[in-house]
Amino acid sequence: AASDVYKRQLLFRTQLCDLPYEELWIALTNPLNKVIQKVKISPGGVNQTSVDIRLVLKAAINALASGIILCHNHPSGSLRPSTHDDALTERIQKAAKLMDIRILDHIILSDSGYYSYADEGRLVR
């Protein structure tokens, strides 16, 4: 639901909105989609962040998470996902599926708002 996505993006806004470089964070959830932990996965450069998918899954497995919400910022202000963002989302979804962990959303934040892969119907169910 849109209200869920709005709440999800608020989870990360204080960490990510004023940064001059990209960072990727994850929120780990229990089977009822309640956030149990937030983890910074990677600081990045001005235009993109490099993400080791193993670190995402390691954090989720260690927390016994059922779901993952990905979130990163675009310091440029653009809310449009890059081809790198799309590829990363797809790769993490495939890897997480093998572990029975759901990707609930991938949110991109900027000063002008947010973009939600879930809202746009871009996550594999």
What is the meaning of each model-derived region?
Residues A1-Y6:
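Short, small-residue-biased leader/transition segments that mark boundaries at the very start
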Residues C17-P20:
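Short loop/turn motifs at secondary-structure junctions and domain boundaries
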Residues F12-Q15:
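Short, P/G- and charge-enriched loop/turn segments at secondary-structure junctions
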Residues L10, L28-L32, S42-R125:
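Active-site-proximal loop/helix of nucleotide/amide-processing enzymes and allied scaffolds
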Residues E23-I26:
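Short glycine-rich loop/turn motifs
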